[in-house]
Amino acid sequence: MNGTEGDNFYVPFSNKTGLARSPYEYPQYYLAEPWKYSALAAYMFFLILVGFPVNFLTLFVTVQHKKLRTPLNYILLNLAMANLFMVLFGFTVTMYTSMNGYFVFGPTMCSIEGFFATLGGEVALWSLVVLAIERYIVICKPMGNFRFGNTHAIMGVAFTWIMALACAAPPLVGWSRYIPEGMQCSCGPDYYTLNPNFNNESYVVYMFVVHFLVPFVIIFFCYGRLLCTVKEAAAAQQESASTQKAEKEVTRMVVLMVIGFLVCWVPYASVAFYIFTHQGSDFGATFMTLPAFFAKSSALYNPVIYILMNKQFRNCMITTLCCGKNPLGDDESGASTSKTEVSSVSTSPVSPA
């Protein structure tokens, strides 16, 4: 084995030289230079500095403006809430541990930090699944003129948290475990060992199949069918121009969110799967650290995409920030068809704003 395994950790560094130490008790500067830990701390500070206000503002603006409280927006707000959990209970801890060069808070806090990081990522993924299903039902109409209402949205939100907990909670109760990963200043599921006391192998297989592959199969199926339906509707002119434009705007926004998730999380999942299937092989600490920390940027892109692509929300946000006035003078009633209320329509024309 080219690493050092302890009771609650695995350091990707052989202890033949006697340098390897517990990541809960000693700085891990033998894994990487101190400036790299400082760079990670600065990066986490940036994510906190931007991620908290952007996600909090998304929630606050929606509460302030009743017109934004549409069924589809419930799912988008769910994403913002999950991101806030990651920022408050994950990023703050990781920033401090990076500043110290090791996980100073001990194994219990490592489990908590790993839990919230996994929970936030899974809520985001399953929220994208719900959005994909909603787009598929509304546009492809496999259930006829189905209306996606508040009850369905609430059920969708509850579903995302149930599935996320089904992924994030098992390591807390003995099925696998959370340990420091990479440069040992952030925590995640144990992909590194086959410790029989924790059944890591079965958990990792379960997580990759149920909580990674299945969601993406659903997402790609829904958007594949959706693309065909949109092309057919455009060719047959079955919907009004405003309806088609409205549905396309919302769909484009959700597709961008899916692409953003792929860009952020696929590198991490790929490296984790490689480590799991090549346990004991030689790899550097930064090999897992870079994709793990890059995945944390997912807390930023969803609200940014939402703000940039939804003119009605953008106008409401500007009005809130400017104490009830919009200096840009944009008329919300003439806003782009990006209004997310289109999710509640069937075959009736869609108001562009």
From Swiss-Prot:
<dbReference type="GO" id="GO:0005502">
    <property type="term" value="F:11-cis retinal binding"/>
</dbReference>
<dbReference type="InterPro" id="IPR001760">
    <property type="entry name" value="Opsin"/>
</dbReference>
<dbReference type="InterPro" id="IPR019477">
    <property type="entry name" value="Rhodopsin_N"/>
</dbReference>
<feature type="topological domain" description="Extracellular">
    <location>
        <begin position="174"/>
        <end position="202"/>
    </location>
</feature>
<keyword id="KW-1015">Disulfide bond</keyword>
<feature type="topological domain" description="Cytoplasmic">
    <location>
        <begin position="225"/>
        <end position="252"/>
    </location>
</feature>
<keyword id="KW-0807">Transducer</keyword>
<dbReference type="InterPro" id="IPR050125">
    <property type="entry name" value="GPCR_opsins"/>
</dbReference>
<dbReference type="InterPro" id="IPR017452">
    <property type="entry name" value="GPCR_Rhodpsn_7TM"/>
</dbReference>
<dbReference type="GO" id="GO:0016020">
    <property type="term" value="C:membrane"/>
</dbReference>
<feature type="short sequence motif" description="'Ionic lock' involved in activated form stabilization">
    <location>
        <begin position="134"/>
        <end position="136"/>
    </location>
</feature>
<feature type="topological domain" description="Cytoplasmic">
    <location>
        <begin position="309"/>
        <end position="353"/>
    </location>
</feature>
<keyword id="KW-0681">Retinal protein</keyword>
<feature type="topological domain" description="Extracellular">
    <location>
        <begin position="1"/>
        <end position="36"/>
    </location>
</feature>
<feature type="transmembrane region" description="Helical; Name=6">
    <location>
        <begin position="253"/>
        <end position="274"/>
    </location>
</feature>
<keyword id="KW-1133">Transmembrane helix</keyword>
<feature type="topological domain" description="Extracellular">
    <location>
        <begin position="97"/>
        <end position="110"/>
    </location>
</feature>
<feature type="transmembrane region" description="Helical; Name=4">
    <location>
        <begin position="153"/>
        <end position="173"/>
    </location>
</feature>
<protein>
    <recommendedName>
        <fullName>Rhodopsin</fullName>
    </recommendedName>
</protein>
<comment type="similarity">
    <text>Belongs to the G-protein coupled receptor 1 family. Opsin subfamily.</text>
</comment>
<keyword id="KW-0449">Lipoprotein</keyword>
<feature type="topological domain" description="Cytoplasmic">
    <location>
        <begin position="134"/>
        <end position="152"/>
    </location>
</feature>
<keyword id="KW-0297">G-protein coupled receptor</keyword>
<keyword id="KW-0600">Photoreceptor protein</keyword>
<feature type="region of interest" description="Disordered">
    <location>
        <begin position="330"/>
        <end position="353"/>
    </location>
</feature>
<dbReference type="InterPro" id="IPR027430">
    <property type="entry name" value="Retinal_BS"/>
</dbReference>
<feature type="transmembrane region" description="Helical; Name=3">
    <location>
        <begin position="111"/>
        <end position="133"/>
    </location>
</feature>
<keyword id="KW-0675">Receptor</keyword>
<keyword id="KW-0812">Transmembrane</keyword>
<feature type="topological domain" description="Cytoplasmic">
    <location>
        <begin position="62"/>
        <end position="73"/>
    </location>
</feature>
<dbReference type="GO" id="GO:0016056">
    <property type="term" value="P:G protein-coupled opsin signaling pathway"/>
</dbReference>
<feature type="transmembrane region" description="Helical; Name=1">
    <location>
        <begin position="37"/>
        <end position="61"/>
    </location>
</feature>
<feature type="transmembrane region" description="Helical; Name=2">
    <location>
        <begin position="74"/>
        <end position="96"/>
    </location>
</feature>
<keyword id="KW-0472">Membrane</keyword>
<dbReference type="InterPro" id="IPR000732">
    <property type="entry name" value="Rhodopsin"/>
</dbReference>
<dbReference type="GO" id="GO:0007601">
    <property type="term" value="P:visual perception"/>
</dbReference>
<comment type="function">
    <text>Photoreceptor required for image-forming vision at low light intensity. While most salt water fish species use retinal as chromophore, most freshwater fish use 3-dehydroretinal, or a mixture of retinal and 3-dehydroretinal. Light-induced isomerization of 11-cis to all-trans retinal triggers a conformational change that activates signaling via G-proteins. Subsequent receptor phosphorylation mediates displacement of the bound G-protein alpha subunit by arrestin and terminates signaling.</text>
</comment>
<feature type="topological domain" description="Extracellular">
    <location>
        <begin position="275"/>
        <end position="286"/>
    </location>
</feature>
<dbReference type="Pfam" id="PF10413">
    <property type="entry name" value="Rhodopsin_N"/>
</dbReference>
<feature type="compositionally biased region" description="Low complexity">
    <location>
        <begin position="336"/>
        <end position="353"/>
    </location>
</feature>
<dbReference type="InterPro" id="IPR000276">
    <property type="entry name" value="GPCR_Rhodpsn"/>
</dbReference>
<keyword id="KW-0325">Glycoprotein</keyword>
